[in-house]
Amino acid sequence: MSARPGLLARAEARLTREWQRRGALAWALAPFACAFGAIAALRRAAYARGWKARVDCGVPVVVVGNVTVGGTGKTPTVIALVDALRAAGFTPGVVSRGYGAKIAAPTAVTAASPPQQAGDEPLLIARRTLAPVWVCPDRVAAVRALKAAHPEVDVVVSDDGLQHYRLARAVEIVVFDHRLGGNGFLLPAGPLREPLSRRRDATLVNDPYSRALPPWPDTFALSLAPGDAWHLDRPSRRKPLAQFAGERVLAAAGIGAPERFFATLRAAGVAPATRALPDHYAFATNPFVDDHFDAILITEKDAVKLGTSWRDARIWVVPVEAALDPRLIALVVEKLRGRTSA
């Protein structure tokens, strides 16, 4: 197996660690962070003051995003929010950039779409929610295309896109993991795309260690719980995680925060060897072919990229369910029914 995935993952992990402290590297990059912050502030001000126009697509938009780099749990949050909005009487659709997708124009994503065209996260959302999902780097174009194809949709959830200021939105939800804002510096000295003080309607904190929530207004805990694993070759075959406890298990993840996946497995009683792959890892070849384990546990996001040509009977997929605080759902529904613009 090529060493490149391991090198990339280690480089990502090293940078992530540096972003959690104000060490020599962070201070060396601080001048660049100041320049980045000035440019970002100017962009925000241009839309806030009307120098540039926001586009109202004729349907309320709920943006689920983050102000930090890396995975925080946005995708399971989007899936849970779509289900909650549907239960509240809405007909939701979803738009996404489609990271890694080879598209230039708005494109519909279905459960049968190839991951190269759809992107891994939109494809997972389409399969889990069965809601209309459209992808495009231009989210305004994606919302317009979705609404034209599905006039029954009365709310659109944007998977990421917090910094896509051109798109008018009714609600903004910012998702953090346990690292919150790291060292508090903007890119490239820290993990922040925008200051922690950035205005939003609600904050979710995905902290597997269940520490106290930060004292921010309208802040809620985000709980992610694993379900029974399902077999990659035979999805109808299920296995509780506890049954892997006595086996030689490898846990592998090509997501933004792989350690969170590993911690989830440990909390369920599994003691796996671990392998962090680069985020959005393509799985062009089987990276496990030379590994000697009884079982290999991967995430749902990675599983959507493994086609029918994969024939590795050791691979099991671990789904994750997000539990949203009822108060958050009530806040979102109230804002949508009031059609308040953020």
UniProtKB/Swiss-Prot annotation:
One of its GO terms (biological process) is lipid A biosynthetic process. GO terms for cellular component: plasma membrane. Pfam families: LpxK. Pathway: Glycolipid biosynthesis; lipid IV(A) biosynthesis; lipid IV(A) from (3R)-3-hydroxytetradecanoyl-[acyl-carrier-protein] and UDP-N-acetyl-alpha-D-glucosamine: step 6/6. ATP binds at residues 68-75. The keyword Transferase applies. GO terms for molecular function: ATP binding; tetraacyldisaccharide 4'-kinase activity. Belongs to the LpxK family. Transfers the gamma-phosphate of ATP to the 4'-position of a tetraacyldisaccharide 1-phosphate intermediate (termed DS-1-P) to form tetraacyldisaccharide 1,4'-bis-phosphate (lipid IVA). This is Tetraacyldisaccharide 4'-kinase. The gene is lpxK.
